[in-house]
Amino acid sequence: MIDIGITKLAIIGGIALIVIGPEKLPGLAKTIGTLLGRARRYVADVKDEVNRSMDLDELKKMKDTVESAVRDVDNTIQTSAADFEKNWADATAQAADTPFNDFSPTPPAYRHPNKKWRVKQGATPNWYKARAGIRTRALSGAARVARFRPHKVN
């Protein structure tokens, strides 16, 4: 942009005050300000338009590269599918030529799980044993003595 310092602006303002006069100077400054604002907006719009067109060109190039990559991938998939179908046809033709063996695997033998269903049905539930005071765990003699020994009073 134009390099105008404060001293140059003061000199231009002084000359404009002498030439135009103090009555018309504020109106002239206002018009110059609006014209400069319009010029800046116009330049910014032109820059934006140029940037947009450049971005569109880049996007078109990217689109073309992606489309070519998709075409290449599609072609490779088609060729691999054709190769696979050819190999499959060859393999099935060879398998059809070989005699068929009468091999039938024996089914697995049934093994009973050995669950003690009747014992479980006849068993008394633990919650009932706890309520009735039935002992479910055996204590050793030493453990029983230690459990029922009276506490020492200090």
From Swiss-Prot:
Cellular component GO terms, alphabetical? TAT protein transport complex
Q: Which residues cross the membrane?
A: 1-21
Q: Report whether Transport shows up as a keyword of the record.
A: yes
Q: What is its subcellular localisation?
A: Cell inner membrane
The answer to whether the entry has keyword Kinase is no
The record's note on quaternary structure and interaction partners says:
The Tat system comprises two distinct complexes: a TatABC complex, containing multiple copies of TatA, TatB and TatC subunits, and a separate TatA complex, containing only TatA subunits. Substrates initially bind to the TatABC complex, which probably triggers association of the separate TatA complex to form the active translocon.
Function, please? Part of the twin-arginine translocation (Tat) system that transports large folded proteins containing a characteristic twin-arginine motif in their signal peptide across membranes. Together with TatC, TatB is part of a receptor directly interacting with Tat signal peptides. TatB may form an oligomeric binding site that transiently accommodates folded Tat precursor proteins before their translocation.
Q: Its family?
A: Belongs to the TatB family.
The name this protein goes by in its record: Sec-independent protein translocase protein TatB
